[in-house]
């Protein structure tokens, strides 16, 4: 096993957005504390390069991760850091998620120009989100609001809000926190009100599988970043997403919570129009996270959620940036 001191420089690949760099700095700081020398390498993703193109117009999946994975496979970087919610559920055999650090706040947050809460927004107020999951759950709560798509990184979206184009935005609480802008949130949605995207708030530290195999150069170094409770929760969420049909742009929310030796998984599938929702919960153990996710997916499908999963193909809804397709995001 290679020690941190024996490594020359560990190259961390990241998207170039401010939020992505902040996420990568979290990992870099932990590695430096463990004695590693770290170099951060910025890589432009397809999704960032074409920020004016609606996400549903991109072919395939992994628009925010494919270039990072390509650089990893070519040996140009040693590790890449992803937002877990951007990572497709299908694996690339040569790559492995070496660590899932402790999760940040998984909730969705409402940011409003006037600082008012959701219940205080006037009828017809324009709310921006590029996520069918958020849009559908918002329609359940406030069908009188006007929901419009919005693209761009978090800084860009917040700028559009403050320029007056929207009355409110729904964004990830973790993104606000990592940019030190949590004070701009008017409201944080309890998961009983709005379930987040699978993996929301979590980071994925990915490397070449051979590098963490027995005797691999990174074996042991990246493992120290892993949080078992977060890994179990995210594993259950992603297993559910894959089992219900992750290739669809359907509004699916899921959140796992580990308490002692218990893992509770809550999930929802919502009609894009916000008229119908199927919500179910199951409890199991962290060791059976994948099976728990698959069993809850089966419960949802038996309840009729599979009909909603087919609906987005005819709705014209934009692809959800919080969702992952069955594709690997492989270049």
Swiss-Prot record:
Pathway: Porphyrin-containing compound metabolism; protoporphyrin-IX biosynthesis; coproporphyrinogen-III from 5-aminolevulinate: step 2/4
Gene: hemC
Biased composition (Basic and acidic residues): 316-331
Protein name: Porphobilinogen deaminase
Lineage of origin: Bacteria, Bacillati, Actinomycetota, Actinomycetes, Acidothermales
Alphabetized Pfam families for the sequence: Porphobil_deam, Porphobil_deamC
Molecular function via GO: hydroxymethylbilane synthase activity
Keywords noted in UniProt: Porphyrin biosynthesis, Transferase
Superkingdom to which the source organism belongs: Bacteria
């Amino acid at each position: 096993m290679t020690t941190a001191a024996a490594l020359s420089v560990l190259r961390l690949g990241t998207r170039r957005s401010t939020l992505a760099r902040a996420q990568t700095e979290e990992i870099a700081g932990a590695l430096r504390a463990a004695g590693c020398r770290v170099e951060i390498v910025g890589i432009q993703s397809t999704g960032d390069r074409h920020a004016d193109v609606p996400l549903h117009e991109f072919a395939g999946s992994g628009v925010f991760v494919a270039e990072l994975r390509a650089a990893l496979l070519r040996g140009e970087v040693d590790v890449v850091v992803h937002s877990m919610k951007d990572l497709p559920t299908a694996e690339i055999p040569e790559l492995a998620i070496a660590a899932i650090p402790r999760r940040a706040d998984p909730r969705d947050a409402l940011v409003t120009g006037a600082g008012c809460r959701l219940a205080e927004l006037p009828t017809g107020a324009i709310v921006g989100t590029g996520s069918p999951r958020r849009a559908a759950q918002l329609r359940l709560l406030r069908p009188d609001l006007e929901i419009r798509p919005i693209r761009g990184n978090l800084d860009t979206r917040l700028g559009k809000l403050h320029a007056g184009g929207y009355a409110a935005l729904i964004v990830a609480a973790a993104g606000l926190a990592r940019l030190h802008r949590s004070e701009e949130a008017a409201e944080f949605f309890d998961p009983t009100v709005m379930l987040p995207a699978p993996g929301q708030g979590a980071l994925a530290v990915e490397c070449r599988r051979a590098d963490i195999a027995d005797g691999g150069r990174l074996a042991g170094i990246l493992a120290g970043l892993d949080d078992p409770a977060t890994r179990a929760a995210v594993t259950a969420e992603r297993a559910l997403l894959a089992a219900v049909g992750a290739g669809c742009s359907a509004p699916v929310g899921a959140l796992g919570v580990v308490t002692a030796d218990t893992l509770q998984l809550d999930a929802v599938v919502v009609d894009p129009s916000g008229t119908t929702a199927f919500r179910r919960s199951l409890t199991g153990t962290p060791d059976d996270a994948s099976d728990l996710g698959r069993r809850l997916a089966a419960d949802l499908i038996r309840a009729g959620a599979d009909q909603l999963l087919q609906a987005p193909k005819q709705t014209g809804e934009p692809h959800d940036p919080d969702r992952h397709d069955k594709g690997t995001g492989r270049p």
